[in-house]
Structure formats: C-alpha cells, structure tokens
Amino acid sequence: MHNASDIQNALVPMVIEQTAKGERSYDIYSRLLKERIIFLVGQVEEHMANLIVAQLLFLESESPDKDIFLYINSPGGSVTAGMAIYDTMQFIKPNVSTVCIGQAASMGAFLLAGGEKGKRFCLPNSRVMIHQPLGGFQGQASDIAIHAQEILGIKHKLNLMLAEHTGQPLEVIERDTDRDNFMSATQAVEYGLVDSVMTKRG
C-alpha cells in the first residue's frame, strides 16, 4: 500500500539534460532550484519549513548577490514554521522576490509580504487572505490562559510586522485581520502586500 507522499513523489516530473558527461535527470523542483526558484506549496509546517530554509541557505552560498525567487501557493499553517522561513529570508544576503500563484493565505500571505520591497508579485487570478493567528489549545484552565496570552502576543507581533511591510497603520492591520480578509491580486497591490500584478514575464 502506498502512502500519500509516495504517490506525490511518483507524480513529480523528471527533466533529462544532456551534459558533457552524458545524460542527467532531475526532478522538476531540483531543476528549478538551479535557476534560483523555490516552491512553497501546501501547508506551512516544520518539515516543509526546514526544506525551504535549507534551499535559501544553499542558494545564498552558491551566489550571495543573485536574487532568489520564492513562488507561493499555500493555505497557510504553523506560525513558528512560517517564522523560520521569514527570518531566513530577512537574514540571507540575496534579495528574495516573492510571487503568489493560486493563493497565499494566512502565513502564506505573511511570507508573500515579507519579500524584498519592489519584488513582490501576484499573478492575475491569485488570491490573498490575511487573518489573525488561530488558537484551539485544549487542556487545564491555567494552561489555556498561558496559551491565550501567547497567541495575543504573536498576533500583535505579526500585526506590527505586516504594518511595516505594507505601509498600513497598525490599527488598520488590526481591524483587517480580525476576521478572514480575502483580496484579489489588484486589491493586494492596493493594500501593500505586494508591489504589482505580473501578467507576463518581463
């Protein structure tokens, strides 16, 4: 019986290249990594975050002066996993250009906005959604209170960072993230989450 990751891996296309030493095959994502393109697809979680961080660090070591392109199609996910990616994006020397394909929701939207100013893009039919961090902790009342305090602290910190990346006042961010807030690509530009809608490769 095959698990979901086996099936997914079987569906990843392979690219065959001719080299001086003969043929070499890559999975499509490894081949795109050679072009400094990283895909952030699906739920943001610890394993995925570690892979993204490793790719960012590898590309920095390869060429610290060349831009990295992070393509995002994600419904969001773990704040801590997302912050590991975000902090690495800010830490490394290359500019990280972010591109939303499909959707960038929740932590996906935060990472989209965290790209290099002037190099954050949406494709025309993509959607962006921002909201406050989700809770859901269960346990003793005292532990629930501790986690509630932690979530409020994270919420305030994320709002401050979104305000910095978008240019929106903090009170506007607080109001607009109180509930799920969906935006078209054009609205995301107007809001400051991205810099422009990309219809054709320049």
Swiss-Prot record:
The protein's name in its UniProt record: ATP-dependent Clp protease proteolytic subunit
EC number per UniProt: 3.4.21.92
Listed GO biological process terms: protein quality control for misfolded or incompletely synthesized proteins
Tree of life domain: Bacteria
Organism: Shewanella sp. (strain W3-18-1)
GO molecular function, one term: ATPase binding
The keyword Endoplasmic reticulum appears for this protein: no
Source organism phylogeny: Bacteria, Pseudomonadati, Pseudomonadota, Gammaproteobacteria, Alteromonadales
Pfam families linked to this entry: CLP_protease
Gene that this polypeptide is encoded by: clpP
Reactions accelerated catalytically: Hydrolysis of proteins to small peptides in the presence of ATP and magnesium. alpha-casein is the usual test substrate. In the absence of ATP, only oligopeptides shorter than five residues are hydrolyzed (such as succinyl-Leu-Tyr-|-NHMec, and Leu-Tyr-Leu-|-Tyr-Trp, in which cleavage of the -Tyr-|-Leu- and -Tyr-|-Trp bonds also occurs)
Task of the protein: Cleaves peptides in various proteins in a process that requires ATP hydrolysis. Has a chymotrypsin-like activity. Plays a major role in the degradation of misfolded proteins.
